[in-house]
Amino acid sequence: MRFLLTASLLTFATLAPAQTVDEILAKNFEAKGGLAKIRAVQSMRVTGKITLGPGMEAPAVIEQMRGDKVRMDITFQGMVLTPMVLNGSSGWKLMPIQGNPNPEALSPEEMKDALEQADMDGFLIDYQKKGHTVEYLGKEKVEGTDAYKMKVTLKSGDVRTVYIDTDSNLEIKLESKSTRRGAEVEGDTNLGDYKEVDGLILAHSIDSGQKGAPGRQVITITKVEINPKLDETRFVMPAKKETPAPVK
């Protein structure tokens, strides 16, 4: 009897963490509108502004489609900057502010970031199918708010720590650890100002910073369009401009 009881307790102890993870995530998905509504999103356009520092604001538009397609445009100092575009398995950027009028292919590290951004459902939904692992690390206070602490190890090996409000069941903070150019880079993102858009509950304030780096980047979202008709050619890398022949 003692052996059977011990075996039962060991079995429960083995299953409990996975059950806890799935239970917390199920409540999180429901709080955001439910899996059916989340998976029904085929495209999205987000309009807002990015604050890069005191007095430095820039309008921004992010367009996204399923099939790993995402594009960000920022208007700054009279120029349209496109720091990231992903079109399936290829990516590019166009940054005339850096003196180059032509598009450039994303580096392997930039591609890694872009692919994570392009996951419309986020890395928590279907995390096992995507090759990620999730661990529940207990509860922790985040600026006075009780939160579930979840460690996510992405398929790439990068680590994300997600804090989910125990009352609202919505994400309030994300910490990241990534390897860039052989060095570990740490960052954090605060999520807030959640609003309902077509049955989905979405954060409209995203405050990000990198450990050891000055300043923070704040994205304030003013409009979200669900399933807008997007022009797929906008994700295609444009041809390079011809360089005028020198005048003889």
Please annotate each region the language model reported.
Residues 22-99, 131-138:
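N-terminal mature ectodomain segment of secretory-pathway/periplasmic proteins
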Residues 113-151, 170-175:
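Short, conserved active-site entrance elements at the starts or edges of catalytic domains
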Residues 13-15:
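N-terminal signal peptide c-region/cleavage motif recognized by signal peptidases
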Residues 1-5:
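Positively charged n-region of N-terminal signal peptides that target proteins for export
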Residues 18, 71, 77, 143-238:
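Gly/Pro-enriched, hydrophobic low-complexity segments
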Residues 92-121:
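Acidic/charged, solvent-exposed loop-and-adjacent secondary-structure segments enriched in E/D, K/R, S/T
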Residues 240-248:
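Compositionally biased, proline/threonine/alanine/serine-rich low-complexity intrinsically disordered stretches
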